[in-house]
């Protein structure tokens, strides 16, 4: 398990505006707990993104490099 920005397809983060959205998303993907599985966290000049706590290794995370949307 690891703490990380959860990623969509093509190495893209889930942008957010509130902790509740991220906590639900992270928890549904197996993060630490229903009460605090994740939160909306600063992601640099690109805005805020969902940060997950103790996310399982089989769930994609943001890695170095650009988001490559099709």
Swiss-Prot record:
Residues 2-68 form the LCN-type CS-alpha/beta domain. One of its GO terms (cellular component) is extracellular region. GO terms for biological process: defense response. It comes from the Eukaryota. It is found in: Secreted. GO terms for molecular function: sodium channel inhibitor activity; toxin activity. This is Toxin Boma6d. It comes from Buthus occitanus mardochei.
């Amino acid at each position: 398990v690891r703490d990380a920005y959860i990623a969509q397809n093509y190495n893209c983060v889930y942008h957010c505006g509130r902790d509740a959205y991220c906590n639900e998303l992270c928890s549904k993907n197996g993060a630490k707990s229903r009460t605090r599985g994740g939160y909306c966290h600063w992601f640099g000049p690109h805005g805020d993104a969902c940060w997950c706590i103790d996310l399982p290794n089989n769930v994609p995370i943001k890695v170095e490099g650009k988001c490559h949307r099709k």
